[in-house]
């Protein structure tokens, strides 16, 4: 079938994980930029072929979701004839369950849901050495600071603790749908390597030009609207009503001050100490 060439950022991610057996890595990639394909399927298959992976754990927002995601790499091992031709038959009858399977060369793959206990995870003598947390945040979660805090703690304690003393590749992937989110907290942690990819790069071009044209992306933006597009495609979550949007502002060249009949300046000090108050709003009117 038709294939799409990888973008430089996708190749860089694979090489970074290949070259660093111990790393905490965050892929903050826009929707539609193959986060799951690379981190749940392509990269672990690559690491396994290089004999750099023994036990993979894939974490989703629920047990069913995680098992569905793990099913993609399981299907590749079972049916991808190119991989089988190069590395041999992978399926082992009796060790090929949904959500948990072992390949012919003794590499294990487990699925876990959000918050599900990962303690004691191992296969024979191996503890997990590749953990990927895929799209853990959702719309409901990011609106609940207490749940975000609890889940962040679970990720950094119970889940990270399944590695062998921190050794291994510990990855989290998703697009930034909330400033208060597990992904945001993960990226802010000391030592985490962050790969941030927006649908449109700083030069106004598609980040994955082999997949998307700028016309397609702009059409998405028109349909989705500014706030939704920024959230889903540009890793810029905006709370509606909390900002002044650029398209609301009308710019003009001001006259010299002597040309105005009068000027009125108003300052709103907003003495409340919450983050929603703009404590430096000043407006100048002239007529």
Question: Can you annotate each of these PLM segments?
Answer:
Residues 1-24, 268:
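Pre-P-loop entry segment of helicase/translocase ATPase cores
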Residues 22-42:
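Walker A/P-loop
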Residues 39-51:
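Walker A/P-loop NTP-binding motif
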Residues 59-115:
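Conserved nucleotide-state-sensing and coupling region of NTP-binding domains
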Residues 99-155:
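Conserved RecA-like ASCE ATPase "motif II neighborhood" in helicase/translocase motors
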Residues 107-114, 261-273:
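Two-metal-ion RNase H-like nuclease active-site motif
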Residues 143-207:
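ASCE P-loop NTPase helicase motor core
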């Amino acid at each position: 079938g038709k294939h799409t060439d990888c973008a430089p950022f996708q190749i860089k991610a694979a090489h970074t994980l290949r070259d660093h057996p111990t790393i905490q890595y965050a892929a903050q990639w826009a929707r539609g930029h193959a986060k799951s394909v690379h981190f749940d399927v392509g990269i672990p298959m690559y690491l396994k072929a290089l004999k750099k992976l023994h036990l993979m754990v894939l974490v989703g927002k629920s047990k069913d979701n995680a098992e569905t995601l793990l099913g993609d790499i399981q299907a590749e091992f079972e049916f991808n004839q190119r991989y089988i031709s190069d590395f041999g038959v992978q399926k082992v009858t009796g060790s090929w369950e949904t959500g948990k399977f072992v390949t012919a060369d003794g590499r294990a793959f487990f699925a876990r849901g959000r918050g599900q206990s990962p303690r004691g995870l191992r296969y024979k003598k191996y503890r997990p050495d590749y953990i990927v947390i895929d799209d853990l945040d959702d719309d409901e979660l990011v609106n609940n600071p207490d749940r975000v805090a609890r889940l962040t703690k679970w990720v950094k304690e119970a889940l990270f603790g399944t590695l062998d003393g921190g050794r291994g590749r510990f990855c989290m992937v998703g697009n930034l749908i909330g400033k208060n989110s597990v992904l945001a907290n993960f990226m802010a942690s000391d030592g985490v390597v962050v790969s941030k990819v927006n649908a449109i790069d700083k030069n106004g071009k598609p980040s994955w030009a082999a997949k998307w044209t700028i016309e397609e992306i702009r059409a998405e933006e028109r349909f989705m609207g500014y706030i939704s597009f920024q959230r889903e495609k540009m890793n810029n979550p905006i709370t509606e009503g909390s900002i002044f949007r650029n398209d609301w502002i009308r710019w003009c060249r001001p006259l010299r001050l002597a040309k105005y009949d009068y000027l009125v300046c108003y300052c709103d000090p907003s003495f409340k100490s919450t983050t929603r108050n703009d404590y430096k709003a000043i407006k100048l009117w002239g007529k």
